[in-house]
């Protein structure tokens, strides 16, 4: 498929989770399929007929084992990214050129020992909590702009 044909592919509908601990640090995981030292927040696709909040809660639990959370907000707008050329046609069965995501801000109500990244279909090798300002510095290139927007919004939002 030529690059022009990829431009006609739709964006995949997805959700992202900004999970905050009691210190307002953000949960990030190191992806299993990426050998470089890059991290991401939990995220994933929306199943047919699924509500966005349900999808976010499901994805969070599938990727981290976490289910003790409270949704405290949303990032204002839908955020989009395009896949880099080397990933086009290789992920999501080649059906999408990127993602359009609704991001939810959640407070983690559990304890660190409850976090389990060794799930049925693991996505992360490791995890840690980071300051929101660190997000753009640890993301893959094609997600840096999204992580900058999220970090900026977190810095201007009162989180309770």
Predicted segment positions?
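A conserved beta-turn-beta hairpin within the catalytic core of GNAT-like acetyltransferases
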Residues: 34-37
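Charged phosphate-binding loop/patch that engages nucleotide di/tri-phosphates or the phosphate backbone
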Residues: 132-160
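Unchanged
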Residues: 47-141
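A short gly/proline-enriched turn/hairpin at secondary-structure junctions
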Residues: 40-41
């Amino acid at each position: 498929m030529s690059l022009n044909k990829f431009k006609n592919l739709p964006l995949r509908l997805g959700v992202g989770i900004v999970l905050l601990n009691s210190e307002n640090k953000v949960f990030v995981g190191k992806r299993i399929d990426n050998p470089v030292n890059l991290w991401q927040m939990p995220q994933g696709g929306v199943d047919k007929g699924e509500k966005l909040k349900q999808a976010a809660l499901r994805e969070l639990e599938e990727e981290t084992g976490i289910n003790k959370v409270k949704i405290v907000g949303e990032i204002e707008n839908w955020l989009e990214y395009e896949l880099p050329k080397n990933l086009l046609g290789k992920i999501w069965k080649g059906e999408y050129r990127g993602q359009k995501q609704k991001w939810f801000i959640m407070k983690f109500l559990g304890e660190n020992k409850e976090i389990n990244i060794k799930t049925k279909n693991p996505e992360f090798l490791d995890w840690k909590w980071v300051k929101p300002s660190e997000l753009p510095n640890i993301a893959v290139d094609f997600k840096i702009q999204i992580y900058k927007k999220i970090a900026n919004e977190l810095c201007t939002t009162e989180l309770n």
